[in-house]
Amino acid sequence: MEWLWLFFLHPISFYQGAAFPFALLFNYLCIMDSFSTRARYLFLLTGGGALAVAAMGSYAVLVFTPAVCAVALLCSLAPQQVHRWTFCFQMSWQTLCHLGLHYTEYYLHEPPSVRFCITLSSLMLLTQRVTSLSLDICEGKVKAASGGFRSRSSLSEHVCKALPYFSYLLFFPALLGGSLCSFQRFQARVQGSSALHPRHSFWALSWRGLQILGLECLNVAVSRVVDAGAGLTDCQQFECIYVVWTTAGLFKLTYYSHWILDDSLLHAAGFGPELGQSPGEEGYVPDADIWTLERTHRISVFSRKWNQSTARWLRRLVFQHSRAWPLLQTFAFSAWWHGLHPGQVFGFVCWAVMVEADYLIHSFANEFIRSWPMRLFYRTLTWAHTQLIIAYIMLAVEVRSLSSLWLLCNSYNSVFPMVYCILLLLLAKRKHKCN
């Protein structure tokens, strides 16, 4: 069972596991109605601060600083201006931190500190919460702190008004991972009584534990296959397709395990899907919809379901506000948000092109393929093609060296995205003629 210990000794998994008892304690105290709303905000904020210091060490200041600045902007700016300024500041700060990682990896050729990598991951999640909250304020979904820091209220009153914002940005169940929780859901959970029955919560968490166990068993089996076979540097021709597919499968299994663990921590604290929702409130969106991800034959569906809460956040933040080339802008911003490593830039641009091709290809197929056997054959073929393209994109995004990216581009795996590129050009030309 050493492999199971390796999962829980993974830096983020370890700290997420350490936070579990405190998440259960918070939920229990809410069920018992044992402490006030302000005490709940303080509990979540203090837990977030302690977890940040434990996991990140001195790098925690890189998360605390933008959180404090974001709250200052949220409380001092007019609702119409708040999103522009918070977005610019947050992405500038995150980009500077990512440049530090680039300097370490590409200039010094040194492996980055594990604590620094955890900090960057947490900072990316903080960017999601900051921009989500600023958009809510800008759109009138959340009422900004009245008066803000410009009013003549005392310091203690300012702090009390800003406490929900601080707590939301740094609350410990979502500090290191987990689906994006809107400020409305967060506030409703903290201010209301828990809708989570202890027995139901126990079975839900047990089911998630079994899922993690099963995924880790698969992870071990696939990793042994990958280790026993050739790598991307020494594979030959069609063998490279198998290498990329199995390696991408290993990445996916790892993502699924960690997403379910993150989801379990949120659920243990009472922020899971069983929470009662007020009218018009956005529901809980889990990141790991494994069933849909593994059976879909459409790249566009995979894109919407992969890391689902982040996909929705990107759609709201970029896609819905883009006037020209919204799809390309969304994936380009995703590459920026992830850190602009060469593989990420290539991978996300390729992903955008594949989604655009996917729309045209399936629209054309639905128009001309009528018989049931042909539809089944078409669905099977496009499922396999989708899985191979996703594997190609995933490896491009995950590799850090230009040499590895070059090997991937020169392998037979490049045939699959090239087929979609050719079909995109042909179908786009046909669509233009029809119009």
UniProtKB/Swiss-Prot annotation:
GO terms for cellular component: endoplasmic reticulum; endoplasmic reticulum membrane. Keywords: Acyltransferase, Endoplasmic reticulum, Membrane, Transferase, Transmembrane, Transmembrane helix. This is Membrane-bound ghrelin O-acyltransferase MBOAT4. The gene is MBOAT4. Catalyzes ghrelin acylation at 'Ser-3' using preferentially octanoyl-CoA, hexanoyl-CoA and decanoyl-CoA as acyl-CoA donors leading to ghrelin activity. In vitro also uses acyl-CoA donors of different lengths from short-chain (C2) to long-chain fatty acids (C16) knowing that acyl-CoA donors from butanoyl-CoA (C4) to dodecanoyl-CoA (C12) are more efficient compared to longer acyl-CoA donors, such as myristoyl-CoA (C14) and palmitoyl-CoA (C16) that are not efficient. Residues 1-5, 57-59, 102-120, 228-240, 339-340, 398-407 are lumenal. GO terms for biological process: lipid modification; peptide hormone processing; peptidyl-serine octanoylation. Its EC number is 2.3.1.-. It is found in: Endoplasmic reticulum membrane. It catalyses: octanoyl-CoA + L-seryl-[protein] = O-octanoyl-L-seryl-[protein] + CoA; decanoyl-CoA + L-seryl-[protein] = O-decanoyl-L-seryl-[protein] + CoA; L-seryl-[protein] + acetyl-CoA = O-acetyl-L-seryl-[protein] + CoA; L-seryl-[protein] + butanoyl-CoA = O-butanoyl-L-seryl-[protein] + CoA. The lineage of its organism: Eukaryota, Metazoa, Chordata, Craniata, Vertebrata. InterPro entries: LPLAT_7/PORCN-like, MBOAT_fam. It comes from Homo sapiens (Human). Belongs to the membrane-bound acyltransferase family. The keyword Transferase applies. Inhibited by c8-acylated ghrelin mimetic peptide with an IC(50) of 22 nM. Inhibited by 1-[2-cyano-3,12-dioxooleana-1,9(11)- dien-28-oyl] (CDDO) derivatives such as CDDO-imidazole (CDDO-Im), CDDO-methyl ester (CDDO-Me), CDDO-ethylamide (CDDO-EA), CDDO-trifluoroethylamide (CDDO-TFEA) with an IC(50) of 38 uM, 6uM, 8 uM and 44 uM respectively. Inhibited by cyclohexenone derivatives such as 2-cyano-2-cyclohexanone and 2-bromo-2-cyclohexanone. Inhibited by steroid derivatives such as alpha-cyanoenone steroid. Pfam families: MBOAT (PF03062). One of its GO terms (molecular function) is O-acyltransferase activity.
